[in-house]
């Protein structure tokens, strides 16, 4: 699903003609999304948003246009699949009753086992209730899964009263002080019969009063997931969704985007047949993967570094104007931000006013990078008080910092000297600005 987008990103980043590469990438993106059964209108809206942002926004200083474009694509694709919504997967209270619903063939019973294993690994005492009385093999399947993961299963194989079974199963596990109880309900209706499914869900809900209802959707239905997820979301405000079989279909993108469009929360995705192949769904992590995780993470890290650097520059301006004081914590933030932005030689070439440093020999730049690493290690061994007020760092503190950072006292002193030099330079700039303003005031009189 959407696998070709990784190659499209690499091709785009290595292209020489920027404008042509942008148009080619957008076409490739549209084709990939439509092939993944994402609604055409959603695809059209997505590409328009990308184009609008390209026109209205400018890349941060030191960020190449290509990288900025990919970061916009990453951002808008993440929104398509749910944005910054991080589902709460841990129970809000103990005991916690979960009711699973879904149409036949959605993988609901297997998902019940996967959920049980997920919570068991987190240290919870979990019980399963087999309340699917319409599919003959459902009870046996859940019992088999329970044995595999060592989780008890309550069921009444000769009884067809699903609500009664669910109620008695929940009561049994509650009396035995179980933390999480997962109820597997009947999935006898096919897609297109959502009304009957939701009616059954309401009846079961009123009897067992679960803390959460989770709808299980098969990814292979693609954008058809919209109707089912929409009605479920309206009927059950406490509900969330698990999208299964993401590994076995090209339509996973369509299913995820359709569910996200309803506003319903996707909690997990099933990524394989094994019981441990259940993943907490994070839209940004998902998009990172389909675009090529390494490429995207390095670009986003660089942009974050630049944003942090620009914030630090504002602090420097405040220091020069006398509104703030420079601390070692500020130096630490500045060096950390610079490291996120890439190799020192590239950073110096891209930052405004630093082009002159592009002629610095490679060996000296490497030494500079090594020094930055060492300074960061030293500052990591300092207390918050020392970072915020370096004047308190005496000989005994220097020895302690050197020992903690695996450096020498001389190297700690070198950092403190560098800090003092920077402080003096900023004070000098401040004095010069003050003198310039004084002359301006006198000349204007």
Curated annotation (Swiss-Prot):
GO cellular component, one term: signal recognition particle
Keyword set includes Ribonucleoprotein: yes
Domain notes: Composed of three domains: the N-terminal N domain, which is responsible for interactions with the ribosome, the central G domain, which binds GTP, and the C-terminal M domain, which binds the RNA and the signal sequence of the RNC.
Keywords noted in UniProt: Cytoplasm, GTP-binding, Hydrolase, Nucleotide-binding, Ribonucleoprotein, RNA-binding, Signal recognition particle
Entry similarity comment: Belongs to the GTP-binding SRP family. SRP54 subfamily.
The protein's name in its UniProt record: Signal recognition particle 54 kDa protein
E.C. numbers: 3.6.5.4
One annotated GO biological process: SRP-dependent cotranslational protein targeting to membrane
SUPFAM superfamilies in the record: Domain of the SRP/SRP receptor G-proteins, P-loop containing nucleoside triphosphate hydrolases, Signal peptide-binding domain
Functional note: Involved in targeting and insertion of nascent membrane proteins into the cytoplasmic membrane. Binds to the hydrophobic signal sequence of the ribosome-nascent chain (RNC) as it emerges from the ribosomes. The SRP-RNC complex is then targeted to the cytoplasmic membrane where it interacts with the SRP receptor FtsY.
Amino acids binding GTP: 102-109, 184-188, 244-247
One Pfam family it belongs to: SRP54
Catalytic activity of the protein: GTP + H2O = GDP + phosphate + H(+)
InterPro entries linked to this entry: AAA+_ATPase, P-loop_NTPase, Signal_recog_part_SRP54_M_sf, Signal_recog_particl_SRP54_hlx, Signal_recog_particle_SRP54_M, SRP/SRP_N, SRP54, SRP54_GTPase_dom
Location within or outside the cell: Cytoplasm
Complexes and interactors: Part of the signal recognition particle protein translocation system, which is composed of SRP and FtsY. Archaeal SRP consists of a 7S RNA molecule of 300 nucleotides and two protein subunits: SRP54 and SRP19.
Species of origin: Sulfurisphaera tokodaii (strain DSM 16993 / JCM 10545 / NBRC 100140 / 7)
SMART domains linked to this entry: AAA, SRP54, SRP54_N
Keyword Zinc: no
GO molecular function: 7S RNA binding; ATP hydrolysis activity; GTP binding; GTPase activity
